């Protein structure tokens, strides 16, 4: 196919990894009419074919072609694959091409970008759209996935104000509410409010299916169990990489959580209804308050 470099709106956007996030981004960009073309890069023929079929991308290219001909490149691959993507992109990255990503961890991705891209790291503005779902793959994509949802941007010192503003505009164009924080803040916060909940959901599911009477238990699950374990249906590969990529912050949150669980276990063992109710009331009120934020 013929690729033409443009400057209209965001021009040619290449999305590397057209799963749920990548394909949804393609749909959203095209619906917003802020691009000339969206190109897909990926290893999954199934996702690429599905993205083409649904109109999320206009064509398929390899990463080298994307680096040579794109105005914006968005990395939507698992965080452990970011370094390899940077390594492929770096020799062909044009000075006017901007990079952003959708990774759920930032410290490790930024380190890889700086080590691989060197002086070109100024062209990378890290981002994390707080959107997704238990389903994964292009088949689950939807154009309104980012509408009204936060996208966190963690600018580098090397980024120019103009480049940061461009990537802010890029994510806002698909309906995202952009917030800027440091990568250190990002990884500490999301270890608690995103990464830990996924780990706990996987852990509960694993606990039940590994028990001797697993079949009987699963035959009796209700809405509460299904709600709690919904996110355990998320991509195992992605969450493996997130856990390892943000392990320092995650281990800190896990230790704090386990201390609470041990405290609750002691209250139950001691038949301490007053202590349990006090703990539950505090947590319950905090959860109710969350709904009015």
What kind of region is each of these model predictions?
Residues 143-230:
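Internal alpha-helical scaffold of NAD(P)-dependent oxidoreductase catalytic cores
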Residues 214-283:
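Interdomain hinge/lid region at the active-site interface
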Residues 12, 37, 123, 150, ...:
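Residues at the starts of beta-strands that form the adenosine-phosphate
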Residues 77-78, 103, 155:
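Glycine-rich, N-terminal phosphate-binding loop of Rossmann-like dinucleotide-binding domains
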Residues 88-139:
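Rossmann-like NAD(P)(H) cofactor-binding subdomain of soluble oxidoreductases
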Residues 2-67:
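NAD(P)+-binding Rossmann beta1-loop-alpha1 motif at the extreme N-terminus of oxidoreductases
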Residues 63-98:
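Rossmann-like NAD(P)-binding element
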